[in-house]
């Protein structure tokens, strides 16, 4: 399976264009690395530089390396938009909550089990 991940606001903090100040999201990076280790194809896709025309590839590659992100390809030039509509899109928070090993999912299933046995 091929997974395509946004970078800012997904794998790191959203710094509103101050990319050198981005802080890694260690939980998401661990999940990406798990998928990579399972043999999935990991593609990074970012809008960095789309509005300014500046080339952020070197910084982005350095950050991904420093953060220990495992990936196969980096695509720059994602169009800038206020909202992306895509038949295969999922919000990062929803994706995290719906993983079978996520704490949120375990809490939901535990709550369901408790209600069932009352």
Stretches found by the model and what they are:
Residues 1-118:
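Catalytic phosphate/metal-binding cores of nucleic-acid and nucleotide-processing enzymes, i.e., regions
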């Amino acid at each position: 399976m091929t997974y395509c991940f946004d970078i800012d606001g997904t794998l790191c903090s959203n710094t509103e264009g101050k990319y050198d100040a981005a802080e890694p999201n260690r939980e998401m990076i661990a999940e990406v690395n798990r998928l990579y280790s399972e043999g999935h194809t990991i593609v990074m896709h970012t809008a960095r530089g789309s509005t300014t025309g500046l080339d952020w590839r070197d910084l982005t590659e350095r950050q991904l390396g420093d953060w220990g992100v495992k990936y196969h390809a980096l695509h720059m030039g994602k169009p800038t938009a206020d909202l992306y509509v895509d038949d295969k899109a999922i919000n990062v928070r929803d994706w995290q909550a719906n993983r079978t090993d996520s704490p949120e999912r375990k809490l939901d299933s535990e709550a369901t089990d408790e209600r069932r046995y009352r």
